[in-house]
């Protein structure tokens, strides 16, 4: 058993599946096609109207009541009242006669047939378009004459569905802005460069308080002093690596480790003939280097002060770890004293 009132399709399908309005089929053919057209609103409307009624001959004079305030709710109830007895009238075989012509014209004015018909409706098209709710036309299957309604309600001319690519201005704005985090290369004066180099000779790794004091003294930013020390350490390590590789050492000897807590931090090419540095390493014992390392402070002390005791044979000959640590400490003290006297 079919329920046309419950399973009625949307209003967009009659425009595609609607038969030719001028074609009138006999009652036997209509009963033969009842299985295919029982769900069409157009068939229900055609059954309920008189046989001699033509669907496209709606008079324009009868279209004036919507302007006088005919409510849409009444037409909707009328459509439901007229749509429900349609199947019963088809099953009974006799068209209903309880409806008046006024109710039929009122229903047909707001029905699907009146809206989709291509008859003269220039006077009543604004009223019909305002009375029909937009939700009943959710499918895009419409005739060519119905496209202006779709454009006016769903696709207004003021708003474009697909935006133009040229309207996007945020990629161009992002290109024009400078990248964050990039600092310009600082240009240091001779006084600033000399002061930075002097501090670098004292300590390769400057502490944060000393760095802030030096930056405030030279009129620089803390980040500029930090970056300068990083670049200077990298340059120093590269030159130190070349020297160590030429003498058979490695670059890791300049880094503080457990076996080498006080690495050699002296610059390349700044030592005299008697001020040679000690190549510290776990497997590089050298009697001559240990002796020169222990005798480095003798060249830097004041001649008025009594000199230190001469190194013992055990100290000069043994390449053990304690002697290496003491030698490196004496080297650092000697460098600091030399810098103080020069300044």
From Swiss-Prot:
GO terms for cellular component: chromatin; nucleus. GO terms for molecular function: DNA binding; DNA-binding transcription factor activity, RNA polymerase II-specific. CDD domains: homeodomain (cd00086). InterPro entries: H2.0_Homeobox_NeuralPatt, HD, HD_metazoa, Homeobox_CS, Homeodomain-like_sf, HTH_motif. It is found in: Nucleus. Its main location: nucleus. Residues 326-343 have a biased composition (Acidic residues). Residues 314-323 have a biased composition (Low complexity). It comes from the Eukaryota. Keywords: Developmental protein, DNA-binding, Homeobox, Nucleus. PROSITE patterns: HOMEOBOX_1, HOMEOBOX_2. Residues 56-100, 240-343 are annotated as: Disordered. Residues 181-240 bind DNA. GO terms for biological process: cell differentiation in spinal cord; regulation of transcription by RNA polymerase II; ventral spinal cord interneuron specification. Belongs to the H2.0 homeobox family. Could have a role in patterning the central nervous system during embryogenesis. Has a key role in regulating the distinct phenotypic features that distinguish two major classes of ventral interneurons, V0 and V1 neurons. Regulates the transcription factor profile, neurotransmitter phenotype, intraspinal migratory path and axonal trajectory of V0 neurons, features that differentiate them from an adjacent set of V1 neurons. This is Homeobox protein DBX1. It comes from Homo sapiens.
